[in-house]
């Protein structure tokens, strides 16, 4: 991994995560709007009523709207990548190289469940939720392509790798 490659990847992670943050904030607003009895901009499109999705049981985790979790997830990716970008020479940002792909993977796993729920439980699609999921996958791709070896090295150091 070169400094230029890492620099480029971090910029992409920040750009993608910023767009995801805007989408997640909008989803949080829509969640509030739907909870207050309002509608969703896609409610007249067959199969694409985000209001139905945001009013479903799957739209909350322990009473917290999952859109808020998206805000936290994208903010975390932005903060970790910005910290690493500004302080590449500092040893303390080493952990950001572990936390970035880990955060992304958690987001992809959770987003996969939510996308499954849209398709097979709710039977409606929320276009803004799908955008958030695609952006999560894209940011995670850059995180893993740049720092995946760090996680592998961490497992190797701790003797977690299979012995052959």
State where each predicted segment sits.
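Membrane-interfacial helix-loop segments of redox and metal-homeostasis proteins
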Residues: 2-164
């Amino acid at each position: 991994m070169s400094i230029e490659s890492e620099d480029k990847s971090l910029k992409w992670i920040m750009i993608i995560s910023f767009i995801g943050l805007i989408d997640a904030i909008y989803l949080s607003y829509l969640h509030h709007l739907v909870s207050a009895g309002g509608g969703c901009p896609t409610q007249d499109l067959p199969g694409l009523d985000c209001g139905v999705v945001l009013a479903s049981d799957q739209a909350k985790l322990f009473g917290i709207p999952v859109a808020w979790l998206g805000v936290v997830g994208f903010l975390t990716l932005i903060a970790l990548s910005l910290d690493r970008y500004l302080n590449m020479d500092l040893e303390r940002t080493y952990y950001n190289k572990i936390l970035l792909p880990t955060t992304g993977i958690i987001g992809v796993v959770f987003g996969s469940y939510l996308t499954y729920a849209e398709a097979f439980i709710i039977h409606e699609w929320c276009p803004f939720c799908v955008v958030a999921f695609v952006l999560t996958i894209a940011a995670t791709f850059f995180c893993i392509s740049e720092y995946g070896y760090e996680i592998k090295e961490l497992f190797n150091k701790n003797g977690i790798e299979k012995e052959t």
